[in-house]
Amino acid sequence: DGQINNNEVARIFVEWKKQANCVKGDDRKTLLNRNFIRMQERLAKLEELLKGIGGLKRFSEKYPQKAMLIIDKTLRFHQHRYNVVGKHLLYLDLDGFLHIYLRHVEELTIAGYYSERTKFQLDEKDVEITIKHVMKALNEEYQVFRDKYPDKQFRKYEDDAYYCNGDYYALRVEPDGRLIQFYKIGKG
């Protein structure tokens, strides 16, 4: 029937048609529906991560400014690719983004919830820039590692942590290239 079943693929396809001025008939309605489904899926992920403090509703009531920030970031998030050189992909998806931001970004600190985690001494907007810088700097090493160990996690911890601008950063990357952890471990 020519229908695309994967919501994200269908949404991107209709977005592309919109940019190419090829939108026809039900395409606008399809795009609205696909965007609504995407929004629901993303908010469900956020709800799951916040269930330890009573869920998204309670979080929003108790911390309205923080809720606005993380909801906006969640809904606007686009997957980041950190390398264009090399055959092995390095990227950050929504799950990795939420893991990093909810645990390690000071502006999103919630009393008693991941509060023991090391926080970036950066503005929220600068965290993304730092991650990008570190991942690009590690790309060559990552490519060599991935060729040698295709099924192992790439890790930088403790003595092997990456040094950048006076701080050391620990990270973990899944075999498929997905960044799943990134945090500051102390001053140099």
Feature names for model-found ranges:
Residues 1-188:
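Ribonuclease/tRNase effector modules and their secretory precursors
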